């Protein structure tokens, strides 16, 4: 994968750093696919999948790590995200990233490719900004919160706190 770049994005009155990479075609006239990672994901965890897909589809791609993931600005230790965190990512962070990268979604409507949390964020963005989206490709999005999901998050948290999962994630996330 390529070297990450960083964009400064204004979010909730704070300047945050967003890690991103351009992949696939370098031709800006080609369709754009934006990749939105899952709940423990980041730019690095996608590996070369976005690049390979964009080459096969003759598209350019934007892969980024949401705030609190990868090499983007870490979440404050005492910060607890509310249940609307995916809405905030879709309605606040993603449009701010597009502005920071000079992506005019009215002129070039991106395709959104999201996995899990990223799939939910893609669907939320596309529902609100229908006129600014070519379409969505989603894998295992969360349409509603299920008890099994809440239990799985609690189990993952315990695993993170009691095993070497923190060390394994550290190579993908600056604040693991």
Predicted regions and their residues:
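N-terminal cap/lid segment of alpha/beta-hydrolase-fold proteins
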Residues: 1-17
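Conserved alpha/beta-hydrolase "nucleophile elbow" surrounding the catalytic nucleophile
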Residues: 114-116
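Hydrophobic, aromatic-rich cap/lid helix
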Residues: 152, 170-176
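Flexible "cap/lid" loop of the alpha/beta hydrolase fold
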Residues: 123-128, 132-164
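Short, hydrophobic alpha-helix immediately C-terminal to the catalytic nucleophile
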Residues: 47, 95, 123-127
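Active-site loop/oxyanion-hole signature of alpha/beta-hydrolase fold enzymes
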Residues: 63-111
